[in-house]
Design a protein with these regions (language model features):
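Structural and coupling elements of P-loop NTPases
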Residues: 1-659
Length: 659
């Protein structure tokens, strides 16, 4: 592996929509850099970054994979992320630890819905981004059309820094516009684009004086490193065309990772995996400080200390002890038992914000034969939930049922394979159900006086108000500490989110503000757990008074079909309660963008592919929750005793708290 300490570093994420050639590009990058001796293949299951057995079998990336190499004296930590929307949680976690990104677009399919979603997240986080326009040799490749599309849907500041030599079968590579061999007219177009975006460059350009191309390129480098401008390069990853130029562009236009080695440790755990012999592997991006083997590190999130046993670089199935992790670098830390994804190590000072992309929209029950040990199944899913917390594994003790949350059907297929290959367990999954939510219909109050059966005393009054869409839960207390002691207020605040997990229809209640307006305790009779019992009763009393509305998940979709199928697609969208923009014709293809309820469109991609004979693409991403029409009813069986039945609820909760 490459020498690391003291080197300049860049941490790069590779992102793409499904089938844009992302893993193939990564393999050729690793080969061109000398990191591997032969190019692996997605189809043959030999790609270095597809190290899981299921990835090799299925030919798709399931988990974000880390690889390191050196190029032009710079250490590059490259994270290859999954392209399929079902594994968006891996993309989300990778975004948080990247300093820069390569977004791969296909010169045939162009910008897809997932491309837009990833782009928006990159912009929200201010991550400098380079675009690699792949598959330039494919029939139907149209780089000019895709560039126009990218400038419309992504950014008007996408700037090609190469001139493509031909397209489709005639594609013969690309020439750097800064090189002497570049076509003067193409270079002038780049210079004019830069001048339009920078007043100082415009003055220089208009002066008529000879242009210093090195200075202009340095300005482009600065703008790209600042995330203002986005260089674009061309290539054919499957043939290795354009890979060297892509690597050069990465080291030219991307900023170096920074962070003081002397400041206190500040890092984040962005991935958890397991090693059969060494246990839990915590993938850590360190922003400042240094961690060494045998150091004791504070887990800020959990307020516990852990002893580091080893720090290793892991690539595919190969690992090497590197002894230390420095600011700006990424490595795997062993020895931190109980560490979880998202945990902050050291101090939180240098940790960047995160972008929320992945929202599980389906819930599924897990089934197994009577001969299978249920404890093994539950344990396996709990381990898998450590690696992907969005699975949200729930074991319902009374019902003897196991439920998980997933993004889509492909994820279920992968889970099935992983359970069999890693744990030797065979399970089946029930029919996926859409996860609805609830929100208050109007403003009102909830009240409880929990005074019997003694000993107990807790009085609470909440104001419940509808909030803006997507606002989640906002909680506030107006009660003075002299009326309700801080420890009781803290217990109440902690229990409010739990109380909202099941509303009047059994779904999580969201997009609301809850304000504690009154609270009382008794000097002798009150126990802190009294407020754990009282809070759900007051919340449910309030929801029962104000009523709740059902919310359903909505998808933003982009459908590309042959022109003759466009009319049927638009009719389908109407039948599914969807809306759409005026369709766009692109050659013989029709592009239709719109919004669809997930509940009505679960099976539509299969149906669409069938009647277009495989000549369609359907891409989507989660757009948010919206109010259901009045005729849509979706009620979920409540788990546990309803707090509205206060007598039974008090008895059941008291028994649970004491037991």
């Amino acid at each position: 592996m490459v020498q690391q300490q003291g080197m300049e570093r860049i941490n790069v994420g590779i992102f793409a929509h499904v089938d844009a050639g992302k893993t193939t590009t990564t393999e050729h990058i690793l080969y061109e850099s000398g990191r591997i001796k032969a190019v692996g293949s997605v189809d043959s299951g030999t790609a270095l970054t597809d190290s899981m057995e299921v990835e090799r079998q299925r030919g798709i990336s399931v988990r974000a994979a880390l690889a390191s190499f050196e190029w032009r004296g710079v250490l590059v930590n490259l994270v290859d992320t999954p392209g399929h929307v079902d594994f968006l949680s891996e993309v989300e976690r990778s975004l948080r630890v990247m300093d820069c990104a390569v977004l791969i677009l296909s010169a045939v399919e162009g910008v897809q819905a997932q491309s837009e979603m990833i782009w928006n997240a990159l912009r929200k986080l201010g991550i400098p981004t380079l675009i690699f326009l792949n598959k330039m040799d494919r029939t139907g490749a149209d780089p000019a059309a895709v560039l126009a599309q990218a400038r419309t849907y992504l950014s008007g500041d996408i700037l090609p820094v190469q001139q493509a030599l031909g397209q489709e079968r005639n594609y013969a590579g690309a020439v750097d516009l800064w090189a002497e061999a570049a076509d003067p007219a193409a270079r002038t177009e780049l210079l004019e684009s830069l001048a339009e975006r920078d007043e100082a460059l415009l003055e220089t350009y208009m002066s008529g004086a000879p242009l210093d191309l090195t200075a202009w390129k340095n300005q482009l480098k600065a703008g790209a490193a600042a995330g203002k401008w986005f260089p674009l390069v061309y290539g054919v990853a499957a043939k290795g065309l354009g890979i060297t130029q892509l690597l050069d562009a990465m080291t030219d236009y991307f900023p170096r990772a920074c962070g003081s080695l002397e400041l206190p440790v500040s890092g984040i755990v962005y991935n958890i995996q397991r090693d059969k012999s060494m246990g839990r592997m915590a993938f850590v991006r360190l922003y400042q400080g240094t961690i060494r083997n045998r150091d004791t590190v504070m887990n800020y999130t959990q307020d516990v200390q852990g002893k580091v046993t080893q720090i290793r670089k892991v690539e595919g199935g190969r690992t090497e002890d590197v002894g230390a992790l420095e600011a700006g670098d990424i490595a795997v830390v062993y020895g931190l038992s109980g560490v979880r994804i998202g945990d902050v190590l050291g101090v939180p000072d240098a940790i960047p914000q995160e972008a929320k992309l992945a929202v599980p929209l389906l819930t599924v029950r897990v089934h197994w034969d009577a001969a299978v040990d249920e404890h093994e199944v539950i344990g396996a899913f709990q381990e898998l939930a450590d690696e992907d917390p969005l699975l949200d594994t729930q074991w319902l003790q009374d019902e003897r049922e196991l439920h998980i949350k997933v993004m889509g059907p492909i994820q279920l297929e992968i889970l099935d394979s992983v359970l069999e290959s890693r744990y030797g367990l065979k399970v089946t999954f029930g029919q996926p159900s859409v996860i609805y939510r609830e929100t208050p219909s109007r403003t009102g109050e909830g009240y409880v006086a929990y005074l019997m059966p003694k000993p107990c005393w807790a009085i609470l009054r909440f104001r419940i108000e509808p909030g803006p869409p997507g606002s989640g839960l906002v909680y506030e207390s107006l009660v003075r500490s002299s009326d309700l002691l801080p420890q009781y207020q803290n217990e109440t605040a902690r229990r409010v989110p739990e109380a909202l997990m099941q509303g009047l229809y059994g779904w999580e209640v969201t997009d609301l503000k809850v304000t504690l307006t009154e609270g009382q305790h008794h000097v002798w009779h009150t126990h802190p757990l009294d407020f754990a019992v009282a809070t759900p009763m007051a919340i449910m009393d309030g929801l029962n008074r104000v009523g709740t509305k059902l919310l359903e998940p909505i998808l933003q979709v982009r459908i590309v079909v042959p022109e003759e199928n466009g009319g049927r697609v638009m009719n389908d969208l109407v039948q599914m309660r969807g809306t759409f923009e005026p369709p766009v014709l692109q050659g013989e293809r029709m592009i239709i963008e719109g919004r669809l309820p997930l509940a009505t469109s679960l099976d539509y991609p299969v149906s669409l592919s069938s009647y277009t004979k495989g000549r369609s693409t359907f891409t989507s991403f989660f757009a948010g929750y919206e109010e259901c029409p009045p005729d849509v009813r979706a009620e979920r069986t409540r788990r546990g005793v309803n707090p509205l039945d206060q007598a039974r609820y008090i008895l059941s909760v008291r028994k649970a708290l004491q037991g």
